[in-house]
Curated annotation (Swiss-Prot):
SMART domains: HOX
Protein name: Homeobox protein Dlx4b
DNA-binding region (UniProt annotation): 129-188
CDD domains named among the record's database cross-references: homeodomain (cd00086)
InterPro entries from the UniProt entry: Distal-less_Homeobox_TF, HD, HD_metazoa, Homeobox_CS, Homeodomain-like_sf, HTH_motif
Localization (cell): Nucleus
Amino acid sequence: MMSMSFMSDTLNSSDPSKSAFLEFGHGLASNQQHLSGFAHNIYPVHGLHSGGHLQHDAPYPSSAPHYSRPLGYAYPGPVSAAAPGAYMPYQPNNHSGALAHTRAENTNHEKPAVIENGEIRLNGKGKKIRKPRTIYSSVQLQALHQRFQQTQYLALPERADLAAKLGLTQTQVKIWFQNKRSKYKKIMKHGSSGPEGELLHTSSSSPCSPGLSQLWEVSMANKVPPMHPSSYMNNYGHWYPPHHQDPVPRPQMM
């Protein structure tokens, strides 16, 4: 009876070395279970198949039965979804918007200002923008020349009236009179000593002016001296034989 009771006591009593080994094994299993769960949280899509079941490579599959449950969808979340804080969303910079607005304003300032009535315009660089040259008709030129012979300067009402009659703008009439006065002064400066200057006081030097024919006649008269017909024959007499009268009269025919 003593041997049987000793064996039962021996079986019931725990060996310290064996209990320590069992506790170490149980702790190792719990650590592996914890690590496998942590890996599952970090990589949720690892080991997924088309059936939607999650496969683990843990050495103790029975220790984590809740991981083998079938999922309702193939992926636990959208693939494109990223963890919060992975990157900062792009926000437009207010400085770049202000810079673009400033450039747009500078571009608008560089555009030339449009001025009506054909005035001279300036662009953003301060250079003059020349308009195309105005082509006047013969009727307009004739009327302008006639008015210039009457007066070289037009008042504002006279200029407006003349521009309305000819179908021109006031600026075109003003520029034409300015150019005409400039040409007139140049001709007066260079030809005031000769007869051309005297005729320019009374007539215009335009091709449409009737004074050009008189100017041409006077200039040609000064260059070619007058010549008498007798002197002309004397200069060229050697080309023609002299006319001699016959001394014997010819008989008259009956």
